[in-house]
């Protein structure tokens, strides 16, 4: 078991979900998962797993698992966070992660919060930085007709996707297919 303690922050989409099982498979201890709250108000609240079938919002075998389901399957606590403030800083101090990992989060994280974990924050960005910095990199990749792209893991700073690059992996998009579906298929096969 790896001694590294990670707080994972993401959205409910597939790109946010996929890195979590990879961290767990590597033996990394994930101390918690944070997702955005539906209400953009200050504060955080812990989400409890749904146990009764009658409480499930969707009863279909075709519903794809999301980041919350994946965390609960591995008994990892999940918090919904509103606007980032003192409460998330307090949660970081309580959980004592060595690093926070982010994949597709919809809020800019303040510098004071970025400095809380010992090794800072790492972001998984679905493009080869510095190209397509900022929100919606997949949209801009497809709009530009790019067929060679990749994934970047970088340290977060107070800029938007401007931190030092830790690693990059190239990825070819299928020829003549420039849709999110083809990206998801490509990334799923890796």
Residue ranges and their predicted role:
Residues 1-190:
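One-carbon transfer enzymes
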